[in-house]
Amino acid sequence: MDGLWVKCKQCQQILLTKELEKNLKVCRCGYHFRMTAQERIVMLVDENSFIEWDRELVSKDPLQFPGYAQKIQKCQIETSMSEAITTGQGRICDIPVVLGVMDPRFIMASMGAVVGEKIVRAAERALKLRLPLVLFSASGGARMQEGVLSLMQMARTSAALTRLSKAGLPFFSVLTDPTTGGVTASFAMLGDLIIAEPGALIGFTGPRVIEQTIRQKLPEGFQRSEFLQKHGMVDIIIERPKMREQLAALLALHCGNSLEGVES
């Protein structure tokens, strides 16, 4: 977050950036600003417990899409990430987990071949290690610059999570602002427990497109996490300052048997 001050989009108050960051980027009015993947990992996992996987995987621009290679390179420099998701193993309140966190700064965390591959590998390692999988989604959907290779990741990630489910290992999906498009239509909505942050935009396509298509005015708060929880699409909404402790409690509740005998 650049600058000394930042304006809240909800209450319009001017906030001191350092104070906002101390409060995990949550305004006094409850508005949740977007976080980077690194900020979220630091917030969640026990100190020095996170080991990143597959950082060497990078997109090779398979379709030679104009400007795509330059955009990838620019995002890598600006974010210090190799791709739009960081995956690895860590501990949350001493509970071992496989963790994946998307970062919307990287081409809006769109899902291409590398993002899909990293999620599949994370699920496969969770299966091998007998650990729960936790994925934090924040995405604009499938990455158009990779065409059908991007769309394939919807099926690949879903298949990997099905194998995890058949093995009796839990997958917690945490939806943050925004979670849309092909990510919503695939792995993000397949969690054994679907968690969301307050006020997160969650849907397949944008509300303006829907209104233009059906020629009707959408209900207030449509596609926000509170609306989805009310209509059975989200199981629980957790405020960011409470995320670590409540996630640990839910993991302990759901993972007691599956974690027996796991080496830390």
Swiss-Prot record:
Enzyme Commission identifier(s): 2.1.3.15
Cofactor binding mode and count: Binds 1 zinc ion per subunit.
Keywords: ATP-binding, Cytoplasm, Fatty acid biosynthesis, Fatty acid metabolism, Lipid biosynthesis, Lipid metabolism, Metal-binding, Nucleotide-binding, Transferase, Zinc, Zinc-finger
Positions that bind Zn(2+): C8, C11, C27, C29
Any coiled-coil regions, as ranges: none
Swiss-Prot/TrEMBL GO biological process terms: fatty acid biosynthetic process; malonyl-CoA biosynthetic process
Compartments it resides in: Cytoplasm
GO terms for cellular component: acetyl-CoA carboxylase complex
InterPro entries referenced in this protein's UniProt entry, alphabetically: AcCoA_carboxyl_beta, Acetyl_CoA_COase_Trfase_b_su, ClpP/crotonase-like_dom_sf, COA_CT_N, Znf-ACC
Zn-finger segments (C4-type): 8-29
Domain CoA carboxyltransferase N-terminal residue range list: 4-264
EC class of the enzyme, as a word: transferase
Pathway(s) of this molecule: Lipid metabolism; malonyl-CoA biosynthesis; malonyl-CoA from acetyl-CoA: step 1/1
SUPFAM superfamilies: ClpP/crotonase
GO molecular function: acetyl-CoA carboxylase activity; ATP binding; carboxyl- or carbamoyltransferase activity; zinc ion binding
Recorded catalytic activity of this chain's protein: N(6)-carboxybiotinyl-L-lysyl-[protein] + acetyl-CoA = N(6)-biotinyl-L-lysyl-[protein] + malonyl-CoA
Keyword hit for Transferase: yes
Required cofactor names: Zn(2+)
HAMAP family: AcetylCoA_CT_beta (MF_01395)
Task performed by this protein: Component of the acetyl coenzyme A carboxylase (ACC) complex. Biotin carboxylase (BC) catalyzes the carboxylation of biotin on its carrier protein (BCCP) and then the CO(2) group is transferred by the transcarboxylase to acetyl-CoA to form malonyl-CoA.
Family: Belongs to the AccD/PCCB family.
Oligomer status and interactors: Acetyl-CoA carboxylase is a heterohexamer composed of biotin carboxyl carrier protein (AccB), biotin carboxylase (AccC) and two subunits each of ACCase subunit alpha (AccA) and ACCase subunit beta (AccD).
Protein's UniProt name: Acetyl-coenzyme A carboxylase carboxyl transferase subunit beta
Organism name: Heliobacterium modesticaldum (strain ATCC 51547 / Ice1)
